Amino acid sequence: DPSFNSWG
């Protein structure tokens, strides 16, 4: 989830 993290 890009809104929460950069990898997923």
UniProtKB/Swiss-Prot annotation:
Residues with the Glycine amide modification: G8
Protein localization: Secreted
GO cellular component, one term: extracellular region
Any one GO BP annotation for this protein: neuropeptide signaling pathway
InterPro entries attached to this UniProt entry: Kinin_peptide
Alphabetical keyword list: Amidation, Neuropeptide, Secreted
Function: Mediates visceral muscle contractile activity (myotropic activity).
Entry's family note: Belongs to the kinin family.
Name of the molecule in the record: Kinin-3
